[in-house]
Amino acid sequence: MTVILLRHGVSTSNTARTLAGRAPGVELTERGTEQAAAVADRLAMLPIEHIASSPLLRCQRTVAPLAEKLGLEPDHDERLIEVDYGDWTGRPIAELVTEPLWRIVQGHASGAVFPSGEGLAQVQQRAVAAIRDIERTLAEKAGRDVLWVACAHGDVIKSILADALGLHLDSFQRIAVEPASISVVRYSPHGPSVWKFNDTGADLSALAAAAPTTPTPGGEVPAAANADNGNAGHRDSP
């Protein structure tokens, strides 16, 4: 089973340098809308059979062009929703970096709980559970490997990737997930493997091939050894 983790495109909150959290009405910018269209063009050639998405508007807008091209109805899953940042919601990043909690978020994420909000450990638990549950449901229904998309938010995707990589949550800020980037995780009986990471423009044709059952010796990705692995960006704010 293979999931394409898609972060929403650039939002009005991203450009304003505020922490959107679950605040209503946060739209994509013009650039974010262009990114959503570009992602749809990249992914539409793949045999994607399911789209799950955070219910927040910026994720809905991001997957809409792809869903239209594929003729799929996105499933809005509350477990993929943005972190509940509580009292931090809507505040400028420039203010938040002066808060004592900021250091905990960056270096000891497993112990970070946002005031009147949720903890990052809770976020990882619900997000990973969502991915695994959807994978299981799709596998039982199809009886074979399925390629699907999950559109979510930066910290949510980073927590899923940390789990797939076997990283402790305290290290998840070392993972970069840019707006409209994709990361690809393949789950097998041998465990998860990360095929793409914070990718914003690589060749994805290898994803249309059958999934290998085990990693290839030497670390090469079968049928995609020459594919560009994308560009890692700057470290995300929470």
What are these regions (language model features)?
Residues 37-44, 124, 128-139:
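Generic structural signal for well-ordered alpha-helical scaffold segments
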Residues 83-94, 140-146, 163-238:
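Acidic, low-complexity terminal tails and accessory targeting/binding regions
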Residues 27, 68-129, 186, 196-199, ...:
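Phosphate-handling substructures
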Residues 47-55, 142-151:
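Short glycine-rich phosphate-binding loop at a beta-alpha junction
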Residues 2, 6-72:
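Active-site-proximal alpha-helix that buttresses catalytic centers in soluble enzyme cores
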